[in-house]
C-alpha cells in the first residue's frame, strides 16, 4: 500500500516501472512521441494569469445533474483540479493522492476541492468511486471552462491510434465527442472568484504536488483574508 505522504513524482515513477513491461513497445513509442510534441511548444501564451476572474460555466456532477462551477464552490475559496479523465492512470494516482493528503488539510482551512474533466458524467462517477474520493468531481462538457483558461491540447493521430489499439477512444469518452483534453492544471481561486495561483503541466506524467498546493493556499489565505 502506498504511503499517503509519498510524493506524486515517486508514485508516477512506480507506475512507469510497472507499465514499461505491460505496454507494447510501439504503443510506448507513440505515447512518448506525442508527449514530446505537446511539451515542445511551451506553456500556451493565452493561459489565464493569476489576478483575473476564474471563468464560470455549466458543469455536470457525477450524478448527471447540471450545475455551475460557481455553485460547486458555494462562495468558498477552492482548489480546482483539471484532469484528463478516469482512463488516465496518472490522473487516478493524482486524485487519489489529493484525497489522501489534501482533503483534510483543505477542510480545516474552509477550502473546497473540485476535480474537473471533459469526460461524460459516468466517467466522473467512475473516477470518484474507484478512488474513494469524497470531494466533488464534475464534467466540463466541451471543455468550456478549460478552454477559457487557455489550457487545451489534443492528442495526435499516432497517439490516438495507439489508444485505439488498447481499446480507448477519447471521442467516445469525452462528453463532446472530440479528442480535446486539458493540460493537467491546478487553479487556486479565492472566495471572490479570482485566480490567485495557476500551475499548468504540459507533461501529463507530472502533476502539482500536494505540498506545493498547500504552500500556495496558505500564502493566498494569508494575503487575501478570506
Describe each region flagged by the PLM:
Residues 1-46:
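A glycine/proline-hinged amphipathic helix-loop "lid/cap" segment
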Residues 33-70:
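N-terminal "domain-start" segment that seeds a small globular fold
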Residues 93, 126, 208-211:
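Generic recognition of short, well-ordered alpha-helical segments
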Residues 95-148:
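Structural microenvironment flanking redox-active thiols in thiol-disulfide oxidoreductases
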Amino acid at each position: 500500500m502506498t504511503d499517503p505522504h509519498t510524493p506524486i513524482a515517486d508514485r508516477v515513477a512506480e507506475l512507469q516501472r510497472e507499465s514499461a513491461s505491460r505496454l507494447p513497445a510501439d504503443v510506448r513509442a507513440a505515447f512518448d512521441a506525442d508527449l514530446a510534441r505537446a511539451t515542445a511548444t511551451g506553456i500556451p501564451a493565452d493561459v489565464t494569469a493569476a489576478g483575473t476572474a476564474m471563468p464560470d460555466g455549466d458543469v455536470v456532477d457525477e450524478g448527471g445533474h447540471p450545475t455551475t462551477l460557481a455553485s460547486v464552490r458555494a462562495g468558498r475559496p477552492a482548489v480546482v483540479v483539471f484532469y484528463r479523465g478516469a482512463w488516465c492512470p496518472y490522473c487516478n494516482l493524482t486524485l487519489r493522492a489529493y484525497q489522501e493528503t489534501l482533503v483534510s488539510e483543505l477542510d480545516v482551512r474552509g477550502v473546497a476541492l473540485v476535480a474537473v474533466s471533459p469526460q461524460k458524467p459516468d466517467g466522473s462517477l467512475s473516477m470518484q468511486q474507484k478512488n474513494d474520493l469524497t470531494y466533488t468531481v464534475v464534467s466540463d462538457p466541451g471543455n468550456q471552462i478549460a478552454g477559457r483558461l487557455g489550457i487545451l491540447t489534443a492528442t495526435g493521430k499516432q497517439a490516438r491510434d495507439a489508444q485505439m489499439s488498447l481499446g480507448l477512444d477519447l471521442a467516445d469518452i469525452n462528453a463532446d465527442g472530440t479528442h480535446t483534453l486539458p493540460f493537467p492544471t491546478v487553479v487556486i481561486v479565492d472566495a471572490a472568484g479570482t485566480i490567485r495561483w495557476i500551475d499548468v503541466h504540459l507533461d501529463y506524467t507530472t502533476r502539482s504536488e500536494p505540498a506545493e498546493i498547500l504552500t500556495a493556499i496558505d500564502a493566498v489565505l494569508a494575503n487575501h483574508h478570506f
